[in-house]
Amino acid sequence: MKHFSFSVTVVILVASLGIGAEKSKKIRPAKPSLTKALAALKIPPPWFARTTVQWKTSQPWKKGRIEIRRLLGLGTAEGNNQAVKLTYLYREKRDIGNGHEWPMYLFMGGQTAWATRAYEEFIGKNPERNTHAYIDLMSCYRTFGEYAKAKATARQAMKNLPTDKWRVSNQANVYEALGDLYAELGDKAQARKNYVQAAALYPKSKQPYGRHLLARRVKKVRGKIDLLDIGALEPGKLPDGKYHGDSLGYTGPLRVTVTVRRGRITDITVRHTEKIHQNATKIIPKRIVDSQSLKVDAVTSATVTSQAIVDATLNAIRKAGRK
């Protein structure tokens, strides 16, 4: 897959805006056990029997994958289940391209444990030129708190970077993913170090297409660096009004409009071009409004979009702070 990847998942950095600031540190809920999840995994899962797929797999994979992405884009449990089952059926008939989309659609469909196993198998057979798979596997491991495995996967990714014009951007992607990992662990120094390396590498990429997105990638990474140390705003200090903020989502630009009333965020609307966002464009704004903080959990399988919404909201609030 010869393009620089956008990781299926990035951490929502835990920088509170301080609006309705927390008086005590919240205890992070325990991560689910990967060992237990894999032990309980049944392939195919029991819910396959209850899931009806209308699509005819007699049609070629190049058409089937479009239907799968449409189903994932519905942002519903039933849509996800149909997408996963359809992907499975194509894999069973050995019509699934080079196979890189098999674990990816499992993860996007919310089957994280299954995706973890599938990514491990795919990388084991295809260790080279699949940086996107390594980064997505890192995301799977982080979901289960397997941080040592995530770091080891990053090292493996660095050893198997493409040797062509995609090498630099893929290397930057790995550094950015490491920054997300360390940010989740609360290691600001290591997070910053990796983000800085990513931001320095993106502009140097000589990739044959997609260069127009590199400046946006740099801007987004710098936003993550800013989130590491952002100071808290005192409750009620935001000026009333509407403010716009921009970021880069999974498929293109994303803009939010933040409404502030009586010093509090009362509404966040999202304008975007995302096709598969798993309702993150509705769920993340609600979480920010409810908590009056950017310290919100990402939507599983749509963490790129989730992070973009947080980043754009931060940009909008900065404008409010300068008013």
How would you label these PLM feature ranges?
Residues 237-245:
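Short, hydrophobic/aromatic-rich segments at coil-to-beta transitions
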Residues 65-227:
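Alpha-helical protein-protein interaction scaffolds
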Residues 7-15:
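Bacterial N-terminal signal peptides
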Residues 223-234, 257:
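Terminal, non-catalytic domain-edge segments
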Residues 23-80, 87-90, 112-118, 244-323:
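Active-site- and interface-proximal helix/loop "cap" or "latch" segments in soluble metabolic
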Residues 1-4:
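Positively charged n-region of N-terminal signal peptides that target proteins for export
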Residues 15-24:
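Bacterial Sec-dependent signal peptides at the C-terminal "C-region" and cleavage site
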